[in-house]
Amino acid sequence: MVTDTSIDSRTARLGVNMVVFEDYSKGAITVATQKREWIIPFNGHIVDVICDSEGVGGNNSQADIIDVNLNGVTIYTTQGNRPSLPQNNTGLFAEAGEPEVTALRVGDTLSYDVDQVDSTGSTRFKITIICQTL
């Protein structure tokens, strides 16, 4: 497993104010909404969304695309900014831009969807949502 130095650097910078939500899927990811949900127990904001895959999915022409939702609405109001992994690839998903909706309040629901996969989704998929408390 690859160590993500971006998480390490944020830990050093944010310290005790950092909260991390994570999920892992060993098998091929499939298109679905609300793959995992978390109830937010603090006021704060989203710092970053990091997605990673160690196993290649299909070999068609589609990227694997992930979306993160806050109370059922995407945090990526610019859809092209969602984390994506080109077909037949592994490693960190690229983001064209950071999420536009980042404010978190006690009781909010944070979730992620798999919006699109190649013929077979990536395997050994990990998502890390890094937040900072106020």
Regions found by a protein language model. Give the residues of each.
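Short, charged beta-turn/beta-strand-edge "cap" motif at the junction between a beta-strand
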Residues: Q116-T120
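Beta-rich globular "head" domains
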Residues: D23, T33-N69, L110-D113, K126-Q132
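Surface-exposed receptor/substrate recognition regions of extracellular proteins
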Residues: M1-S9, F42-H45, A63, E98-R105, ...
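Positively charged, low-complexity intrinsically disordered regions
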Residues: T11-L14, E37, P83, V106, ...
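Short, functionally important structural connectors and interaction interfaces within domains
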Residues: S6, A32, W38, F93-A96
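Glycine-rich, low-complexity segments
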Residues: M1-T30, V47, N69, V73-N88, ...
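Terminal beta-strand-rich extracellular "head" domains
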Residues: E54-V106
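Beta-strand-rich interaction surfaces with strong enrichment in secreted/lumenal proteins
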Residues: Y24-A28, K35-W38, E98-T102
